[in-house]
Amino acid sequence: MDSQPPVNESTPSTALSNFGELVPFYSSYLWNRLASLLPTSKPIFLGKISNLYRQTVSRKRSISFPLPLPSDFPSSSTITSNVSADTARIHGVLEEIMADVLSNLHDIQKSLDFWRSRAEGSNARKAYFMIFERGPTAFVNESTKFVSKSLSEDSAMQHLCQSSSSHMTERMRVLVELRSALASFIAQLYVELDKRGEDLVKIPEKALPSLLAVINGLFSNLEGSFSHLHAVRECDSSVDGSYPMPLVFDRLPEVNEEGSQWTDCELTDAINLVHKNLEKLNSYLSVMVGKHRKPRRMTLYWVRYTCGAVGLSVFSIWLLRHSSLMGSSDIENWVHDAKEATMSFFSDHVEQPLLSIRDELFDTFRKRHKGVMETEEVQLTQDSLHRMLRNFCEQATREKVPDNASDQEMLEVVMNRYEKELVHPIHNLLSGELARGLLIQVQKLKLDIETAMLELDQILRANEINFAILAALPAFFLSIVMLTVLRTWLKKDSKAQGRGRIARIHRRLLVVEIEKRIMQYQSYIEQGRDKDAETVFGLLIYSLERLYRVVEKPARATDEWDLVKQDLIELGRPQQQTSYKLTVTQRLVTVYDCLLPTLKRQ
């Protein structure tokens, strides 16, 4: 291909109609100028850098789903002889093929899920995507088209929705075909490895050339599947730019499986050729998936980011105006006020309530502060009232009052005398017992008030710890919120690798997806739809690989990894019975703790 930047988004047209197209135009121009300085017309140097980066990322990536090979099959780390060295190199090539193809399948599946979610939305949601979620250039273009069509005809909204549906449908169609081709490739390779595993260990001198020939044929089939995409591309495609050149893989020389053994040089050349074809496949998929992938996060949420940038700029200007750089002390005053408010909140709602609770729990009643009303004061008032009632009754009745007479009995005598005195209030106020009766009632009222205050003081003292806890509630709720956020962050509950409830749900849904694909595979086999069954089996391997990655860490934490790993391998065996596979899926979600629901639901 000609030297050009690996652009994943829109490519500018030659007729520049607005300022938004100038940026990609000049960036493309500068890239071409830089590429022209290289010693060759083809981007070999850039390709080597890209391949080196891809290999580095591949090394960092965790080991993918195991290959269907015998346990004694030598890996790249166990080289004991020339024969085992060639076999180990083949093992490394197979692992790299599986890892790269499954990684590309994952990228395709993520984009496909995005387009399906948008396509299933309402017309308003589709229109919003076309205008606001494809970048500022698309925002200007689609807004202009929408306004012009609204002024000229009444079906502007309908036209926008149809354009959105066409935009999404075309991308989904290409991604589905790419996914089907890669899934078939994975399925065929997996089945061949399952068939030839024993031969690769026992007679590698014959099995290795045969396997390389099979891989060569699989690449040829993949080339034919991808060439179909170029043939059926629509002339009015909404995908910007042109497709890359049709993918052409290098061919191995004709192999005579019953002939003489291959030399080490021929095996090395064949392995290098497989590596080269894999690099071509990755380069082709990076361009094709890049043209049909979901918008990048920056493009998808550019409106939010723009509003955030504008708001941040306004806030920065406002902050600068109130800073010491402009001679203002507002920020220092605000910081001081915030510090004082924080300290006050901590003192009122944390420190003092805790101290009060401590004092209430560990101090004795004798160390308490003096209350509003003491029992001794009430007793003095009660004794004074008793003496006043006794003297009044003895003078009024001219009889000695018994020692066991209650205040209530004497008060009845006072009230009877008081009622008689009220017949002539003026005369009796000056010369009668009316004044003494009033004073006795005042004393009785004073006693009642002091008694009520004493009871209230006792209630307050008894509930002092409750009031202290009530004052500490704001700080308590704030601590609960902070601990919840910290727990979610530590558990990474939003990912399938986490330990929380959401992570467990994601892992169980992966098991459900695996079970559905097992049943779909069996249904296609019974209907004689071998091609569709092959594609579904490849997607089954992809789902198993995803579950294999996300369940490894939690399964190791519960010491269940060896058993879980063996069950996942059994689910991927092509010759295994469907009924047994369904039994294994039930065992996964009912036996292993790493795949069980949350403890609360149990």
Swiss-Prot record:
PROSITE patterns tied to this protein: HOMEOBOX_1
Transmembrane segment boundaries: 300-320, 465-485
Xref: PANTHER family: NUCLEAR CONTROL OF ATPASE PROTEIN 2 (PTHR28234:SF1)
UniProt protein name: Protein DGS1, mitochondrial
Organism name: Arabidopsis thaliana (Mouse-ear cress)
Biological process annotations from GO: galactolipid biosynthetic process; hydrogen peroxide biosynthetic process; mitochondrion organization; response to water deprivation
Gene: DGS1
Taxonomic lineage of the native organism: Eukaryota, Viridiplantae, Streptophyta, Embryophyta, Tracheophyta
Subcellular localization(s) per the UniProt record: Mitochondrion outer membrane
GO CC annotation terms, alphabetical: mitochondrial outer membrane; mitochondrion; protein-containing complex
